[in-house]
Amino acid sequence: QAPNYSTASYNVVAVKINLFLSTNNKLYIHDTGVRAVYLAGMKVYLAANPTASSQTFNSDTLVYILDTGINEPNYYINLY
């Protein structure tokens, strides 16, 4: 399960997803470390395996990324 992060303890970075999406509107976001992503109020755990953290987003989805501060942010956004 995902850790229960508190937004008051970490830097919150707002990323506006406004990219070219494929015809199936599949946007894969995965992370090399232990992070959490807030999508429209829903916290999603990001695993090293891209398929484990795959989500379907709209092009106007606002993504909030919580950085634990332990390591430098290392996020990958793959479009398929």
UniProtKB/Swiss-Prot annotation:
GO molecular function terms attached to this record: serine-type peptidase activity; toxin activity
GO terms for biological process, alphabetical: proteolysis
Statement: the UniProt record of this protein carries the keyword Secreted: yes
Entry keyword annotation includes Protease: yes
Main subcellular location: secreted
Protein keywords: Fibrinogenolytic toxin, Fibrinolytic toxin, Hemostasis impairing toxin, Hydrolase, Protease, Secreted, Serine protease, Toxin
UniProt-listed Enzyme Commission number(s): 3.4.21.-
Single GO cellular component term: extracellular region
Quaternary state and interactors: Monomer.
Family per record: Belongs to the peptidase S8 family.
Function statement: Serine protease. Hydrolyzes the alpha chains of fibrin and fibrinogen completely, has lower activity on the beta and gamma chains of fibrin and fibrinogen.
Protein name: N-V protease
